[in-house]
């Protein structure tokens, strides 16, 4: 246990233990490490990690934090990529407590499963499983849902994802606690469900799902998308979506941990069981952009998703994301979640042993899975060899014929080069998993080449919707400082992930600032969907949102490179 700043902090640990038991109050460096270390960025010391088992215990723990002047970081799955789920290297003036919500994972379906009430630790994977039995699906259905990310975490960070009809994760219906400037805790119930007036009674009823149908407000109109589908079609000089967009900032939505969220109410969508997947290859980025504009201008419904990756990113995924690809393809999401947890635990153990490092489990996994055949379908590897740029396009089954016709006519034109094919079931699954594997490939590459690299320099970028020159071309003096780069993203939204590994001896902070400025000069917004965390300075309008939610600055202090001091001092 780290040394508390004062006796009051030590007393707080005793109070937490009385609330949830010693087993769920973690204080040793080894026990807290999986919670205090970010996936790519962020690490720091905490007084304790709390693992409450109920919403009422969350509420009671918050009261202890207020009474003992502690900073609270409410953490869900800790899958964030910018360090905002844990402490950072900042000048904190109070001890920090992480409150992990993962034990509180209940989900209540309401209004004939057209909406869901997800408690603080409910995962997207669990929600997806629960909704499938009702022929429904949640906002996010790929990517973060496979590594244990939570519904509340997605709302708090306005996560985007691949579903171009749906837009960022957003709700105006949530139940949360905020602390006012006088240090008083307020429970705010905007779920649209009458649960009474006493906070502990409300939270207990909420967790048990104890309400009458008549106490629940009706759902919104049912559809396969949102207004975002019309928004993304507009080819104007602004990004389609980005983290600081005030359109998507409302209480829990975009809160980045500046309040304590107990549950959110989100709409669900009809599950499209009949889908068609097309794999598209070209050597010219301009052809993909022209194709994007053809689909956005078409009269029919938007595709479900349109995911880009370079051929080089494909190669990185099959070499350095192979454990992700093989595990998901042959064992499923549940096994991958367990594997991530086991790897995190093992890295924590190895880090404490002489002669080992904090990435030993990654090295072992990399070696073991290199011996396993990936069995990638031949048409995918053929396109990998033939074309530099790839697009994975998923459409509704009813749009299969129209999509194939559009693609045939597009590539028949003398001004365009490339080819396509409709995937069979194995090809569709494999292509999707390779695209997902790219997201972890650059991180694994860095881990395996740490001796020759200084740091990862990563971006998630929201480009202008009308940006024709969308693929980054770095000046030579910047490109020479990079050892590796991977480009991939949600192409129709013009949201790209650009993961770089800087060479040994390069100043990654200075390099990131220079590269960020190049993007801003192009009219892009950074970040697009991973939020500001500990690596991006939040703009003024977003800081104003944070300060309104948290006037004492006791929740996730310092996020977005803001002040870590009490009262924003």
Describe every region a protein language model picked out.
Residues 29-104, 118, 138-139:
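Glycine-rich N-terminal segment of FAD-binding domains in flavoprotein oxidoreductases
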Residues 2-6, 20, 38-48, 70, ...:
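Conserved glycine-rich FAD pyrophosphate-binding loop
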Residues 16, 65, 498:
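Residue-level signal for inorganic ion chemistry
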Residues 15-36:
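Conserved oxyanion/phosphate-binding beta-strand-loop segments in alpha/beta enzyme cores
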Residues 250, 260, 265, 276-283, ...:
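C-terminal cap/substrate-recognition region of VAO/PCMH-type FAD-linked oxidoreductases
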Residues 89-104, 110-150:
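Anion-binding (especially nucleotide phosphate/pyrophosphate-binding) glycine-rich loop
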């Amino acid at each position: 246990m780290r040394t508390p700043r004062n006796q009051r902090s030590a007393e707080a640990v005793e109070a937490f233990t009385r609330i949830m038991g010693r087993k769920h109050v973690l204080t040793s460096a080894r026990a807290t490490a999986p919670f205090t270390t970010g996936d790519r960025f962020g690490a720091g010391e905490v007084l304790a990690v709390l693992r409450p088992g109920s919403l009422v215990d969350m509420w009671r723990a918050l009261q202890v934090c207020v009474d003992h002047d502690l900073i609270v970081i409410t953490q869900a799955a800790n899958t964030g990529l910018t360090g905002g789920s844990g402490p950072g290297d900042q000048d904190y003036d109070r001890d920090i407590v992480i409150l992990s919500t993962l034990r509180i994972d209940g989900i209540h379906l309401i209004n004939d499963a057209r909406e869901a009430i997800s408690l603080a630790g409910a995962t997207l994977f669990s929600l997806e499983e629960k909704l499938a039995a009702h022929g429904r699906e949640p906002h996010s259905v790929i990517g973060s849902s496979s590594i244990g990310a939570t519904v509340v975490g997605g709302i708090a960070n306005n996560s985007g994802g691949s579903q171009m009809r749906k837009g960022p994760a957003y709700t105006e219906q949530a139940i949360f606690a905020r602390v006012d400037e006088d240090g008083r805790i307020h429970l705010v119930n905007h779920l649209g469900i009458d649960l009474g007036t006493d906070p502990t009674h409300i939270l207990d009823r909420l967790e048990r799902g104890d309400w009458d149908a008549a106490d629940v407000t009706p759902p919104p109109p049912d559809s396969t998308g949102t207004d975002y589908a019309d928004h993304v079609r507009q080819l104007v000089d602004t990004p389609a979506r980005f983290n600081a967009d005030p359109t998507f900032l409302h209480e829990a939505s975009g809160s980045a941990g500046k309040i304590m969220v107990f549950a959110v109410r989100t709409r669900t969508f009809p599950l499209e069981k009949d889908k068609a997947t097309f794999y598209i290859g070209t050597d010219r980025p301009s052809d993909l952009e022209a194709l994007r504009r053809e689909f956005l201008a078409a009269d029919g419904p938007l595709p479900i998703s349109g995911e880009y990756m370079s051929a080089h990113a494909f190669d990185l995924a099959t070499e350095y994301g192979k454990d992700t690809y093989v595990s998901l393809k042959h064992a499923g999401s549940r096994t991958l979640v367990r594997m991530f947890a086991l790897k995190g635990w093992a890295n924590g153990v190895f880090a404490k042993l002489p002669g080992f490092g904090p990435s030993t489990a990654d090295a072992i996994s990399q070696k073991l899975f290199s011996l396993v055949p990936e069995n990638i379908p031949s048409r995918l590897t053929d396109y990998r060899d033939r074309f530099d740029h790839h697009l994975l396009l998923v459409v509704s089954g009813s749009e299969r014929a129209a999509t194939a016709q559009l693609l045939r006519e597009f590539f028949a034109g003398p001004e365009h080069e490339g080819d396509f094919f409709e995937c069979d079931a194995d090809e569709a699954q494999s292509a999707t998993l390779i695209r997902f594997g790219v997201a972890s490939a650059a991180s694994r590459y860095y881990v395996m080449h740490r001796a020759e690299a200084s740091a990862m320099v990563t971006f998630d970028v929201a480009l202008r919707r009308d940006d024709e020159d969308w693929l980054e071309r770095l000046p030579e003096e910047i490109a020479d400082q990079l050892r590796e780069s991977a480009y991939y993203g949600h192409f129709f939204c013009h949201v790209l992930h650009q993961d770089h590994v800087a060479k040994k001896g390069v100043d990654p902070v200075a390099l990131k600032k220079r590269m960020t400025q190049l993007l801003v000069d192009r009219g892009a917004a950074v970040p697009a969907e991973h939020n500001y965390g500990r690596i991006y300075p939040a703009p003024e309008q977003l800081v104003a949102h944070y300060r309104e939610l948290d006037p004492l600055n006791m929740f996730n202090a310092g996020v977005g490179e803001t002040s870590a001091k009490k009262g924003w001092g």
